[in-house]
């Protein structure tokens, strides 16, 4: 279990310490579950009333909240961001031994950097290059001539097809498949003719991809995931999609082929986005958005009808279904009124 003096933690976080710097911090916890040795954080003033009951040894908070502190405190401008950084310092995620499991199958032509770890039953094919400190989990498959940059980690049972490039310090969770064939077919009088998918997938640095997500290889050009992109679980990224730097994609999103998304976008969960179009930088699509046309202006976009009681929803749906007829009737009435005038 990691541990650190509160004063040392404050220094690493560039936080202002109030209280005993010799307190030993052993973990991060919520305000409700924290015990002695834990540090917690407060991001909303409405939780001030809970500070008296909180048993944490220290709390991360803003200057405005400091008068309400009942324990040692670290004062920062952004408690939530500080929480993320101190959670990294006190991370308890298991780290594998820096070795290669006897059951791993590694082609003789593969190039392995220093301190590479390869888990049981993993397969590394010919021409693969693994950078320094790469971790390949048990049961992973890395196809021919693929490259994985230094410090990247594949959790168990990740599949990386041939000719894929993954940058440095990336994290890919279990069950994800990168580089499978895109959905490319031509129709010959009712019969589907497969189009070989000869593009690649290029993933930048510091990319994180959740569990059971699929990123298809390009048909001709490459599918590209920019630097700093984060993609949640169970997303489908079709062939030739380009996602710009530092864009965030929540769970269950489906992106059709040849879509281009700009930088610093946020795509809400379960959204569906049409292909062969562009979304500009700094666009937010709220959850379950259906994006059928290009977006050319930054901003927040939504679609669909939010949850309603069923009886109300049925009436709303009926109104929507009849809106064209009602519009025609209204225009007809307007013409009659104008004629009377």
From Swiss-Prot:
This protein's pathway: Glycolipid biosynthesis; lipid IV(A) biosynthesis; lipid IV(A) from (3R)-3-hydroxytetradecanoyl-[acyl-carrier-protein] and UDP-N-acetyl-alpha-D-glucosamine: step 3/6
Keywords: Acyltransferase, Antibiotic resistance, Lipid A biosynthesis, Lipid biosynthesis, Lipid metabolism, Repeat, Transferase
Catalytic activity field: a UDP-3-O-[(3R)-3-hydroxyacyl]-alpha-D-glucosamine + a (3R)-hydroxyacyl-[ACP] = a UDP-2-N,3-O-bis[(3R)-3-hydroxyacyl]-alpha-D-glucosamine + holo-[ACP] + H(+); UDP-3-O-[(3R)-3-hydroxytetradecanoyl]-alpha-D-glucosamine + (3R)-hydroxytetradecanoyl-[ACP] = UDP-2-N,3-O-bis[(3R)-3-hydroxytetradecanoyl]-alpha-D-glucosamine + holo-[ACP] + H(+)
A Pfam family reported for this protein in Swiss-Prot or TrEMBL: LpxD
EC number: 2.3.1.191
Enzyme class: transferase
CDD domains membership: LbH_LpxD
GO molecular-function term, one example from the UniProt record: N-acyltransferase activity
Effect of residue 165 to R: In firA200; confers temperature sensitivity and reverses the rifampicin resistance of rpoB mutants
Site, as annotated: Involved in determining the hydroxyacyl-ACP selectivity: 290
Active site: 239
Cellular component GO terms, alphabetical: cytoplasm; cytosol; membrane
Activation and inhibition: Inhibited by divalent cations such as Ca(2+) and Mg(2+).
Functional note: Catalyzes the N-acylation of UDP-3-O-(hydroxytetradecanoyl)glucosamine using 3-hydroxytetradecanoyl-ACP as the acyl donor. Is involved in the biosynthesis of lipid A, a phosphorylated glycolipid that anchors the lipopolysaccharide to the outer membrane of the cell. Prefers (3R)-3-hydroxytetradecanoyl-ACP over (3R)-3-hydroxyhexadecanoyl-ACP as the acyl donor in vitro, which is consistent with the structure of E.coli lipid A that contains over 95% (R)-3-hydroxytetradecanoate at the 2 and 2' positions.
Protein's recorded name: UDP-3-O-(3-hydroxymyristoyl)glucosamine N-acyltransferase
